[in-house]
Every structure is written in C-alpha cells, then in structure tokens.
C-alpha cells in the first residue's frame, strides 16, 4: 500500500468535494478507493472547519470506519490508523495556515502591482486625454459664445418680427381702407351706369316700339294701296280684254269672206294678243296668279284666234 501522509505538499493534489452536511465522523471524513489506482486513497471533506471537531476513538472507528477499509487495513491495528489520521489532520491544518499566509502575501503583491499599474494607466490617460480635454473645453467656450450670439440673434429676430408684424398690420389696415373707399366708389359708378343703361334701354325700347308701330301702319297702308291698285289694273285689263273680244267677234264674219283681209286681220289680232300677253306677263308680280282667273269667261276668244288657220 502506498502512503503519502508524511508531507504537507503530498495533499495538494488531493480532491476535496462538498457534500451534504456531516452528522457523524463517518459522514465527515470518508476514505474511498481511488478509481485510477486502488493503492491510493482520495480524501473527501465536507468542510475544512469541521476538521478541528473530528474526534477519533477505537469504538467509533470500529463502528463506522473499519468496514469501509477492509481488506486494505485488515492487518493494521487501531492505534496506527488513529496516528495516521491525526497526522493527516495536522497536515491539513498546516496546509490551511500556509495557504492563508500565501494568500495574504499574494494579495499584498497584487495590490501593489495593481496600484502601480493604475498609476501608469492614469498617467497614460492624462497624457492621451489632455488634448481631447482641451479641445472639449475649447468647444465648450465656443458653444457658450455661440449660445450668446444665438440668444442675441433670437432677440433681434423677435424684435424684427414684432416690428414687421406691426408694419404689415398697419399697411393691411391702410390698404383695407383704400380698398373699401375704392369699392364704395366703384359701387356708386356701377349703380350710376346701371341707371343710365336702364334709362337708355327704356328709351331705345320705346323708339323701337314706335318705329315698329309706324312700320306696321305703313305696311298696312301699302298693302291696302297694292290691293286697290291691283283691283284697278285688273278692272282695266278686263275692260280692254272685253273690248278686244267684242272687236274680234265683230271681225270674225269679215275674215271668213275675205281671206286676204282675214289673214291680215288675223295677224294683227295675234300681234295685239301677243302684246296683251306680254303686258300681263310683265305685270304678273303686281296682279298675282289670281288675275287670270278673272279672264276665264273670255278665254274662248283667244282660243278661237290662236287656232284659226289663215288660208
């Protein structure tokens, strides 16, 4: 069996694990076989503070420990095991004190190194940040100056705005007054023009009505004169046609007796008839279409004249 309980450093590589709170010595300190090598033992402690309270006696060991170490300690007696465990306890306490001392010295050294490093970093930061701090301070001064200029500009702007608003309102009121006066004068002119236009329109309407009335009277008089003239012309033409018909009726027997004379008279009658027809045709616009209806009873004379053959 390999044993490494003789030196303090031999326990630095052992594993310590925290488990449930100890209730017995067996629970407080348990030695188990190592997995890698059965010849070594691994020590598991619940708490280092419990080491001072460990009390060992042969009966406790016999009740709680012997069965766990069989057959490793089958030939060892109780006193040797107790001595070994006490040595282990002392070694653990010594290791604890040494570690506390080493931890104190290390803490002091680390504090010194930290202070030195801190001073170095502060110095480096001061050297690096000084231009930036100066620039920030300069920018702050310029910002204050800009704020002052901005405040002055804002004050002047407000004053200018107030003055401008007053001036604009004054001009608007003056313009409104002029506009009202112009609107009043324009309305007066419009009313005057409307009155003149209405008066002129009424006069023109009266003159137009008078002219229309005069024209109507003149047209009616002209129409009456035309009808009267038509009547006279038609009456005269009827008289002439009647006289011509009587002459034709008078000369028809003579035409039958003397062909030469009849031929001459027939030509003369045809000539006279042609002249009458020409006169009637030229004056048809004055007589109208109905003037020939008044000649219907005597048309047989014209037919006799126009159809009579000259031998």
From Swiss-Prot:
UniProt keywords, alphabetically: Coiled coil, Cytoplasm, Cytoskeleton, Microtubule
One Gene Ontology cellular component: ventral disc
MF (Gene Ontology): structural constituent of cytoskeleton
Domain of life where this protein originates: Eukaryota
Cellular localisation: Cytoplasm, Cytoskeleton
Principal place of residence: cytoplasm
Summary of the knockout phenotype: Morpholino knockdown has deformities in the ventral disk including shortening of the microribbon structures and flattening of the ventral groove, and increased number of cells with four nuclei. Knockdown has no effect in the adherence ability of the cells.
Coiled coil: 185-233
GO biological process, one term: microtubule cytoskeleton organization
Quaternary structure and interacting proteins, as annotated: Interacts with EB1.
Function: Giardins are involved in parasite attachment to the intestinal mucosa and in the cytoskeletal disassembly and reassembly that marks the transition from infectious trophozoite to transmissible cyst. They may interact with other cytoskeletal proteins such as microtubules in the microribbons or crossbridges, to maintain the integrity of the ventral disk. Involved in formation of the ventral disk.
Protein name: Giardin subunit gamma
Organism: Giardia intestinalis (Giardia lamblia)
